């Protein structure tokens, strides 16, 4: 455990130097604090060896050199980290033995053939993104990401619509997704489609429409996963929950998308438990460098394990993140 103090620019530069040094592995930033004064002002460098000194002696020395009053140290997060580390209340994970630069990544080229053009009358494009089961080395499902016909983002596509059209169009695009999956020939792979949660509430007969379109395009309801995003507040939760129950009764799977980025978070998870939970990519990005992100994801993993919810990490682009 290292405590670095100083101006932000110098501390960040020193931290990056330490992290880049080949003699150090698994260097993670646990916290970054902005205090009115240094905790060990003018002390210089102090080294403590827990293989030589007792935890009690080290802790006494740390408190001796501290420039904070004793009543402040008991509530200070930095001192809590120090005390936990010294006393061994939290197990120290073993250093990672992987070397990312020695890994070989294999790519399955065009597993579903060449891309398809727009279907007749199709109002938007779709990007089919594979969801991979890394331990088995295979694609477990495909997520249909909506795009404007200019290739623009979903936000841009929906902003181009009148407000009263948004939920109706959101629902209608799922029919095109199912048609695309049928034409592409996804076999037994699962298909995940994103849906604004309020589309299930504001569009009459939404569930019946989805189930009809799934069967019309020769897909099995158990093959389809409806991903509801956290980025929209759910009003009328009773109606939403009723729609969820109907979908599940038909065999359709449910997922919470972008978990950790939106309105509901854990509150939504207490009210309905999906088959899958997808951690927002902002939490996953550079997780190998962030102690807070690791702690949060560790808690999410524990929660989903207890609830038997399959967990998906969004946006993994580096071996270190995996």
How should these model regions be labeled?
Residues 3-5, 147, 229:
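Short hydrophobic/aromatic beta-strand micro-patches
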Residues 214-287, 307-322:
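The catalytic core of metal-dependent phosphodiesterases that act on cyclic dinucleotides
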Residues 1-123, 127-128, 132-135, 178, ...:
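Charge-rich, low-complexity N-terminal segments
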Residues 103-217:
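Bacterial c-di-GMP phosphodiesterase EAL domain
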Residues 206-212, 239-242, 291-298:
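Charged helix-capping and loop-helix junction motifs
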Residues 296-308:
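Alpha-helix-loop-beta-strand connector modules within alpha/beta enzyme cores
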